[in-house]
């Protein structure tokens, strides 16, 4: 089996992005561009991957971790110079090496595999990945002879009128015979106006040496899109989102309006779940089967089991078990967990709390730092008072308890199972089973006193 290597070029600054963030670390559908490239290389069964870093090297290393090895390009002197920096790691190896830019998030593993296969079948020294561009302006053109053999790559500024009419373009991805690549790099010079070492010049060197130079033309031009500015980032995101949404629909998920379903790459959604319009689902969210995610919802890094309904609400790092429903207009903050058939109605907030099966929190309530048992009724306007100005404190509520509307539960307390908290109470002491707790001033009516008031 032929050894397969890859080099990811990720050293450039990307000034056109106008950003403090290194270009390849901008995200497309929840994953950085360079991570998209790495994921597809790994899916193509390429395990020996070197990333060339330079500007923002530490941040790129933080993003990719130990999944790859790194070569440092201290000065950005061109793509050929970048590949030279990998010689200590790759120079002595046999096999094939794919070179790809870290700002091309749309390439797929299938395309990489086809490129490798084409290259190997033709025993080439280098195979250029090409595509047909609807508008080739700005791209290097692939010039072939009368029998289709690649003669050269000509850049836009150097192209004749006839060459400018060519629609086959260089995508900037190459598959090299590894040893021939590094041998040719030793002959590479920077004798050009920019004083840089161009990887495309290696192709000319190999051609001069009589090596086989081929080009594999892929079908989907969109894959080759490089991202250099915010406009291109938005376009790449739209293309990626369409891919994600199309696959979800093929897998049995209903997207009412695919154009406004913003779903990240790593999200998983079960069959017969319905996603309405203007929904954002981010991070490593998993949604089960037969769920309904209502319009205007935002869900991030959360787990929803089967048959869950979320209406116009926000969930962050939360878990919702089967049969539960949330919203409209509620917020599950990190470490919220709802048991089976829990109802959290409108304008509620739950944070770092477990709510047991069958419990109902109807409206306008805050539950934080608490554990609630099963089949509890939490009335309107109940507040779990969890912060004393220094510490967050915990409250427990037992099964079948009833908490009346407009009550304050001041932590730390334990509301026992089957106990009853009267409406309007401020509870500061724990209760025993079957207690009724009432903590409010007795009402006093003063006859005729309202006439004396200034309103």
Curated annotation (Swiss-Prot):
Known role: Catalyzes the last two sequential reactions in the de novo biosynthetic pathway for UDP-N-acetylglucosamine (UDP-GlcNAc). The C-terminal domain catalyzes the transfer of acetyl group from acetyl coenzyme A to glucosamine-1-phosphate (GlcN-1-P) to produce N-acetylglucosamine-1-phosphate (GlcNAc-1-P), which is converted into UDP-GlcNAc by the transfer of uridine 5-monophosphate (from uridine 5-triphosphate), a reaction catalyzed by the N-terminal domain.
Cofactors named for this entry: Mg(2+)
PANTHER family per UniProt: BIFUNCTIONAL PROTEIN GLMU, NUCLEOTIDYL TRANSFERASE
Pfam families: Hexapep, Hexapep_2, NTP_transferase
Presence of the UniProt keyword 4Fe-4S in the record: no
Major location category of this protein: cytoplasm
Protein residues bound to Mg(2+): 103, 228
Reactions listed under catalytic activity: alpha-D-glucosamine 1-phosphate + acetyl-CoA = N-acetyl-alpha-D-glucosamine 1-phosphate + CoA + H(+); N-acetyl-alpha-D-glucosamine 1-phosphate + UTP + H(+) = UDP-N-acetyl-alpha-D-glucosamine + diphosphate
Active-site residue numbers: 363 (proton acceptor)
Protein's UniProt keywords contain Nucleotidyltransferase: yes
Gene that produces this protein: glmU
Positions that bind acetyl-CoA: 386-387, 405, 423, 440
Pathways per UniProt: Nucleotide-sugar biosynthesis; UDP-N-acetyl-alpha-D-glucosamine biosynthesis; N-acetyl-alpha-D-glucosamine 1-phosphate from alpha-D-glucosamine 6-phosphate (route II): step 2/2; Nucleotide-sugar biosynthesis; UDP-N-acetyl-alpha-D-glucosamine biosynthesis; UDP-N-acetyl-alpha-D-glucosamine from N-acetyl-alpha-D-glucosamine 1-phosphate: step 1/1; Bacterial outer membrane biogenesis; LPS lipid A biosynthesis
Family indicated by similarity: In the N-terminal section; belongs to the N-acetylglucosamine-1-phosphate uridyltransferase family.
Entry EC number(s): 2.7.7.23, 2.3.1.157
Annotated spans, N-acetyltransferase: 252-455
The protein, known as: Bifunctional protein GlmU
NCBIfam families, A to Z: glmU (TIGR01173), PRK14354.1 (NF010934)
GO BP annotation list: cell morphogenesis; cell wall organization; lipid A biosynthetic process; peptidoglycan biosynthetic process; regulation of cell shape; UDP-N-acetylglucosamine biosynthetic process
Species this protein is from: Limosilactobacillus fermentum (strain NBRC 3956 / LMG 18251)
Recorded GO MF terms: glucosamine-1-phosphate N-acetyltransferase activity; magnesium ion binding; UDP-N-acetylglucosamine diphosphorylase activity
Residues given in the record as UDP-N-acetyl-alpha-D-glucosamine binding sites: 9-12, 23, 73, 78-79, 101-103, 140, 155, 170, 228, 333, 351, 366, 377
Entry GO terms, CC: cytoplasm; membrane
CDD domains named among the record's database cross-references: GT2_GlmU_N_bac, LbH_GlmU_C
Keywords (A to Z) from UniProt: Acyltransferase, Cell shape, Cell wall biogenesis/degradation, Cytoplasm, Magnesium, Metal-binding, Multifunctional enzyme, Nucleotidyltransferase, Peptidoglycan synthesis, Repeat, Transferase
Cited InterPro entries: Bifunctional_GlmU, GlmU-like, GlmU_C_LbH, Hexapep, NTP_transferase_dom, Nucleotide-diphossugar_trans, Trimer_LpxA-like_sf
Localization per Swiss-Prot or TrEMBL: Cytoplasm
Subunit structure: Homotrimer.
């Amino acid at each position: 089996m032929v050894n397969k290597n890859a080099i990811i070029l990720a050293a450039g600054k990307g000034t056109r992005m106008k950003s403090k963030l290194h270009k390849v670390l901008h995200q497309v559908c929840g994953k950085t561009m360079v991570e998209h490239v790495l994921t597809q290389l790994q899916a193509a069964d390429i395990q020996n991957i070197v990333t060339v870093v330079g500007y923002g090297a530490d941040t790129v290393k933080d993003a990719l971790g130990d999944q790859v090895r790194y070569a440092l390009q201290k000065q950005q002197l061109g793509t050929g110079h970048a590949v030279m920096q990998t010689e200590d790691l790759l120079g002595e190896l046999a096999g094939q090496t794919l070179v790809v830019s870290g700002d091309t998030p749309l390439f797929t593993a299938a395309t990489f595999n086809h490129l490798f296969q084409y290259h190997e079948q033709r025993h080439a020294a280098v195979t250029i990945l090409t595509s047909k561009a609807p508008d080739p302006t700005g791209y290097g053109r692939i010039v072939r002879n009368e029998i289709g053999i690649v003669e050269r790559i000509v850049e836009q500024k150097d192209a004749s009128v006839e060459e400018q009419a060519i629609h086959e373009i260089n995508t900037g991805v190459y598959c090299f015979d590894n040893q021939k690549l590094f041998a040719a790099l030793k002959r590479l010079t920077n004798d050009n106006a920019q004083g840089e070492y161009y990887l495309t010049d290696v192709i000319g060197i190999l051609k001069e040496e009589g090596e086989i130079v081929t080009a594999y033309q892929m079908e989907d031009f969109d894959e080759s899109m490089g991202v250099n500015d915010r406009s291109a980032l938005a376009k790449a995101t739209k293309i990626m989102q369409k891919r994600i949404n199309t696959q979800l629909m093929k897998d049995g998920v209903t997207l009412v309006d695919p154009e406004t379903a913003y779903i990240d790459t790593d999200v998983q959604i079960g069959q017969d779940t319905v996603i309405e319009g203007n929904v954002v689902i981010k991070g490593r969210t998993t949604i089960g089967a037969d769920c309904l995610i209502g319009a205007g919802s935002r869900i991030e890094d959360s787990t929803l089991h089967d048959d869950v309904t979320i209406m116009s609400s926000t969930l962050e790092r939360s878990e919702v078990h089967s049969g539960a429903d949330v919203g409209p207009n509620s917020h599950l903050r990190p470490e919220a967990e709802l048991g089976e058939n829990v109802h959290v109605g409108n304008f509620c907030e739950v944070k770092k709390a477990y709510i047991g099966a069958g419990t109902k929190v109807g409206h306008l309530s805050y539950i934080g730092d608490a554990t609630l048992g099963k089949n509890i009724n939490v009335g309107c306007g109940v507040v779990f008072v969890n912060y004393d100005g220094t510490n967050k404190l915990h409250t427990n509520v037992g099964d079948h308890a009833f908490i009346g509307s407009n009550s304050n539960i001041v932590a730390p307390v334990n509301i026992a199972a089957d106990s009853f908290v009267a409406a309007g109470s401020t509870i500061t002491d724990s209760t025993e089973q079957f207690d009724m707790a009432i903590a409010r001033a007795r009402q006093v009516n003063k006859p005729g006193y309202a006439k004396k008031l200034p309103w």
